[in-house]
From Swiss-Prot:
Full protein name: Pyridoxal 5'-phosphate synthase subunit PdxS
Gene behind the chain: pdxS
InterPro entries: Aldolase_TIM, PdxS/SNZ, PdxS/SNZ_N, RibuloseP-bd_barrel
Keywords: Lyase, Pyridoxal phosphate, Schiff base
Family: Belongs to the PdxS/SNZ family.
Organism of provenance: Clostridium botulinum (strain Langeland / NCTC 10281 / Type F)
Length: 290
């Protein structure tokens, strides 16, 4: 079990500093691959459409996911509902490279997340704070991402979640060892993971940014805040020029510390996706999960 988990963590490390793009068909997947995406997330509706159309959002049609797998050479991920381990079994059976237990879909279980250690395929999960991140890692997640607020084109929640996780890790490093068990109890997180963060000052897995990233500057901002890579959902294919924006976000993620490059790749991209103000949302996806 431990060897398998270490392998999954190492596989996740291979996509560090890359961009993962949401796609709804093979054509979009090819655009993402040509733009330099390190992986694609296959789903039937991007988060902005899920938010707009409402209803129950479930995992995507396996046939559509397999078509995307066959269309590209890069890894293909797909989403399942929180707690829906049968959807995860189906995705593992059709050969996805990673499963996202995602708050963007309608939760199937309001008590438990999936026990990810039951699967060979690696999982990524969202987190708003250190406690959520460590609980998901304790369940077997090989990768963490900020929850942000998907489908809004508004990066503020992703920034909040990344800053929260970073500040809580710094605080943990300053906590006396005899108090760590109390912290573990308060966070509901495994003690060995609390010890790891207190000693190393970082998560034991990679942490990507997700939720509301719409521009090259957004991607560079999250990288400068300490993220290991970027998920882009609605921000590319809901923009005026998906191909140009996809390439620009990939370049911004690579050269996130170079303002000259960032300025150049931000030119002439056309309109970004229309954004939403968080305070006016009827449903906040980030509140899902625990």
């Amino acid at each position: 079990m431990e060897k398998k988990y270490e392998l999954n963590k190492n596989l996740a490390q291979m996509i560090k500093n890359g961009v993962i793009m949401d796609v709804v068909n093979p054509e979009q997947a090819k655009i993402a691959e040509e733009a330099g995406a390190i992986a694609v997330m296959a789903l039937e509706r991007v988060p902005s459409d899920i938010r707009k159309q409402g209803g129950v959002a479930r995992t995507s049609d396996p046939k559509m996911i397999k078509e995307i797998i066959n269309a590209v050479s890069i890894p293909v991920m797909a989403k399942v509902r929180i707690g829906h381990f049968v959807e995860a079994q189906i995705l593992e059976a059709i050969g996805v490279d990673c499963i996202d237990e995602s708050e963007v879909l309608t939760p199937a279980d309001d008590l438990f997340h999936i026990n990810k250690k039951d699967f060979k395929v690696p999982f990524v999960c969202g987190a708003r704070n250190l406690g959520e991140a460590l609980r998901r890692i304790g369940e077997g997640a090989s990768m963490i991402r900020t929850k942000g607020e998907a489908g809004t084109g508004n990066v503020v929640e992703a920034v909040r979640h990344m800053r929260t996780i970073s500040s809580e890790m710094r605080k943990l490093q300053l906590t006396p060892k005899e108090e760590l068990m109390t912290v573990a109890k308060e966070m509901g997180a495994p003690f060995n993971l609390i010890e790891y963060v207190a000693e190393k000052g970082k998560l034991p897995v990679i942490n990507f940014a997700a939720g509301g990233i719409a521009t090259p500057a957004d991607a560079a901002l999250m990288m400068q805040l300490g993220c290991d890579g970027i998920f882009v959902g609605s921000g590319i294919f809901k923009s005026d020029s998906p191909e140009k924006r996809a390439k620009a976000i990939v370049k911004a993620t690579t050269y996130f510390k170079d303002p000259d490059v960032l300025a150049k790749v931000s030119e002439n991209l056309g309109g970004a996706m229309s954004g939403l103000e968080i305070s006016k949302l009827e449903t906040e996806f980030a509140e899902r999960g625990w």
